[in-house]
């Protein structure tokens, strides 16, 4: 489905929260949305690797990487695996890499920046906890929508207005 965040904001002003404008769109899908699954980690993408292996149909992985600009939490192999397993998109409060390949992948990806260095895999992080960045709290089971205009969060699923 194609989402337009300004239209969703206009149709549901009482429901949406808008994330501060700090993200760039890197994925092959220019818009995406779905149920939130969260990861909180810092320069360790072990849980990202685990989650993209699972069925992600109708879901968006929201990764709170602490805003680190020193390591990439997502690369082409994990993005391709996420697309294969039906994930709608991934939002990374941190960096990604392999951006040219990710731009060709059928997956929505928004992140702060790109960085060529991968993370360590120490198995450290938290799954499905509330995470806060960009002035908004992302809660598992709520919904996130993203496009080139920005990222919004809602406590319930939203439909594009007619």
Curated annotation (Swiss-Prot):
Residues reported in the UniProt entry to bind substrate: 75-78, 97
User: Cofactor(s) for this protein?
Assistant: a divalent metal cation
Alphabetically ordered keywords of this record = Lyase, Metal-binding
Which residues, if any, are the signal sequence? none
- Keyword Transcription among record annotations: no
Q: What catalytic activity is recorded?
A: 4-hydroxy-4-methyl-2-oxoglutarate = 2 pyruvate; oxaloacetate + H(+) = pyruvate + CO2
Query: What is this enzyme's EC?
Result: 4.1.3.17, 4.1.1.112
Note on cofactor:
Divalent metal cation.
| Residues bound to a divalent metal cation | 98
**Name of the top EC class for this enzyme:** lyase
Example GO BP: regulation of RNA metabolic process
Keyword Lyase in annotation? yes
Q: How is the subunit organization of this protein annotated in UniProt?
A: Homotrimer.
Q: Which family does it belong to?
A: Belongs to the class II aldolase/RraA-like family.
Q: What's the protein called, per UniProt?
A: Putative 4-hydroxy-4-methyl-2-oxoglutarate aldolase
């Amino acid at each position: 489905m194609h989402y337009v965040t300004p239209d969703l904001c206009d149709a549901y002003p009482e429901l949406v929260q808008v994330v501060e404008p700090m993200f760039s769109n890197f994925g092959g899908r220019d818009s995406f949305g779905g149920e939130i699954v969260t990861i909180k980690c810092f320069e360790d993408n072990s849980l990202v690797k685990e989650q993209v292996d699972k069925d992600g149909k109708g879901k968006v992985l929201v990764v709170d990487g602490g805003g680190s600009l020193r390591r990439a939490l997502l690369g082409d192999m994990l993005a391709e695996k996420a697309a294969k397993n039906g994930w709608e998109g991934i939002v990374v409060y941190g960096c990604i890499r392999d951006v040219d390949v990710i731009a060709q992948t059928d997956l929505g990806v928004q992140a702060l920046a790109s960085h060529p260095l991968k993370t360590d895999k120490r198995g450290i992080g938290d799954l499905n906890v509330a995470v806060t960045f960009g002035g908004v709290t992302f809660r598992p089971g709520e919904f996130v929508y993203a496009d080139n205009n920005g990222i919004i969060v809602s406590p319930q699923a939203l439909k594009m207005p007619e």
